């Protein structure tokens, strides 16, 4: 067992957990860069993978390949958990949002494109999706065949922040 000094519970720098408001959660999810998608393997074990994501209209969206372990898992069991966090300094100041929901896979190109455009904009890809399509990239249609968009509809969202006793994050 690891032992160390006991925390000074009276210290003004001690970070205490506090629930985030709906507004704080929305702002945090909008600004987040990487989320962790938690799923259950067909044999019952956990599987978690980091993904770039977007957030809008109360839903999480991400792009993925049309084939692979993630797709196999989501097709077998669409119930997911999605987590985004941020920490400052020594991790004593942190924020974390956890979403419990159901993932839907979008394969229709017309439905996927608005989500892909938002992801391109968020991650500052130097060309818009429309420009990419117009450039005559011969592989673009093949690439679209290999891409899917995952859309998570939450049924529960929790958010916590660890703040110092003086209220600072």
Regions found by a protein language model. Give the residues of each.
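Charged, gly/pro-rich active-site loop segments
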Residues: 1-16, 91-169
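Beta-strand-connecting loop/turn residues
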Residues: 58-59, 78, 155
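Active-site-adjacent structural patch at catalytic or cofactor/ligand-binding sites
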Residues: 65-66, 76-86, 95-104
